[in-house]
């Protein structure tokens, strides 16, 4: 997994945290030295596990993060390839998997979310994003989604998706 023991001490069976308190502290410290930074307009982007993490920012820290773009996120580690998830979540699958699932926690979403996914993603099954979409609808949470037909993992790198992400952040963070 090529990560330090300190990283694993925080994130072991806890991908929902993934160091958010530290990241928020760093952003606040940077803003203290750079008054041009507006902490009322913080966005986050991530792809794959970073997509899971970007959405989690709005679930666990929606009081800080205002908008997120999640590209091809593995939103529930119970439906992803187990060899990858075991590195971070352990085996066997237990209650901690459900607690860390964006799908089971979607009702806690605060802020503006854009989900991007590729129709032909062979790394993270698109059903992971569909599961989150279903949970968001059931929780009556607003969100945007962009499907890139014919695209695989990393659909957000498509030129059309790049423009849509920029538009999303401009709309959501500039008002």
Where are these regions (language model features)?
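Cap/lid segment of the alpha/beta-hydrolase catalytic domain
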Residues: 1-47, 53, 75, 80-83
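C-terminal catalytic histidine-bearing segment of alpha/beta-hydrolase fold enzymes
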Residues: 2, 130, 137-175
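Short beta-strand immediately N-terminal to the catalytic nucleophile in serine-hydrolase-like folds
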Residues: 44-46, 71, 116
């Amino acid at each position: 997994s090529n990560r330090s023991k300190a990283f694993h001490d925080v994130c072991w069976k806890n991908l929902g945290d993934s160091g958010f308190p530290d990241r928020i502290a760093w952003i606040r410290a940077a803003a203290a030295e750079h008054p041009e930074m507006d902490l009322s307009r913080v966005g986050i982007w991530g792809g794959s596990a970073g997509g899971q993490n970007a959405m989690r920012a709005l679930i666990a820290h929606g009081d800080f993060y205002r908008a997120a773009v999640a590209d091809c996120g593995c939103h529930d580690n119970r439906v992803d390839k187990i060899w990858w998830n075991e590195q971070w979540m352990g085996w066997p699958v237990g209650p901690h998997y459900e607690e860390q699932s964006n799908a089971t926690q979607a009702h806690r979403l605060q802020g503006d979310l854009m989900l991007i996914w590729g129709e032909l993603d062979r790394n993270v099954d698109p059903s992971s994003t569909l599961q989150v979409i279903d949970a968001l609808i059931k929780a009556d949470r607003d969100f945007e989604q962009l499907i890139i037909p014919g695209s695989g993992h990393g659909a957000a790198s498509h030129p059309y998706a790049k423009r849509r992400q920029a538009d999303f952040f401009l709309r959501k963070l500039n008002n």
